[in-house]
Amino acid sequence: MKETIAKSGLAATVKSVFSRRKFFGRAAAGTAAATTAMAFPAIARAQGPINFRFQSTWPTVDIFHEFAVDFTKKVNDMTGGELRIEMLPAGAVVPAFGLLDAVSKGTLDGGHGVLGYNYGKQNALALFSSGPAFGMDANMILAWHKYGGGKELLAKLYDAIGGNVVSFLSGPMTTQPFGWFKKPVTKTEDLKGLKFRTNGLAIDLFTEMGAAVNALPGGEIVPALDRGLLDGAEFNNPSSDRLLGFPDVSKVCMLQSFHQSAETFEIIFNKDKYNGLPKKMQAIIENASEAASADMSWKAMDRYSKDYINLQKDGVKFYKTPDSILREQLVVWDRIVAKKSETNPLFKEIEASQRAFASRAMAFDMDYNNNRRLAYNHYFRKS
């Protein structure tokens, strides 16, 4: 009997001890949870969303600025509002050609533009936007950039010039027209002394072909044509050209050219600001740039094809650039590339990398893909 009582007393004591431990354990856990619940909302409220101020190199009216805003919307949505990027138009903070410096210094947190606008800082930068591309289109350039070593070479270029930025190439452009003129250009000699606007390495191309080149940002081209400061100019595509007012000052547009047949956009972040972001946000930004790239190409196909028709309704006459001029462009490119490679080792390294990638990508593309002109003529141009 005593043994039973003793055991019962021991059991009760043990049970009491465990009960007290469980109570205090739960109480401690509850206190920690309460502390956590109070602490984390306070941190979240103190931090709030991260706000970045960006600027594009495009006027508000241009579809290019719309593409820039599309990218920021994707980032803002994908981060659930934790990162909010505001995209201002060209000139809101700095001129279009001043974007790289402004982002490097932190005056702006980032921007949307093209590498050709930085040609004056390092001519090899233009190989990513307005160079010969060795027959590649813009999608091939993006493929080379991501998988063929281009990304690493661009980072090397920025390090060489002290560019404090993180760069993402995004948005393949169509082949750009030869230009808008007062009358059709039928031979290379027609360019002699012509006051012409272009940018990037295409400056060298048109200069060697006889034109007097003036590099202007997109929003300044049509006013210069209207005032007679230019005799001809190129910008980019049916939508941009129409929105910027090209058909108001010219009714002649020459299609097809090798001066800018593979340009892409560039999205840049101030490196310090970008490196300060959580890794999750950095991953979102990279994926958003690629999502925006794909979406831009689809939107461009829809809008450009419509505005190509609208331009014709506006009275614009389109002419194919003569093959003799196209062949001359290729010959001139050979001379320019050889000359730049002699004096700029980085230019030579990037050019060689592009050329090697193009030699296999072009062969695959031409051998595997159809001549779509045959199908178009069959379905839509029956006599």
Predicted regions and their residues:
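N-terminal secretory/targeting leader peptides
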Residues: 2, 10-141, 159-383
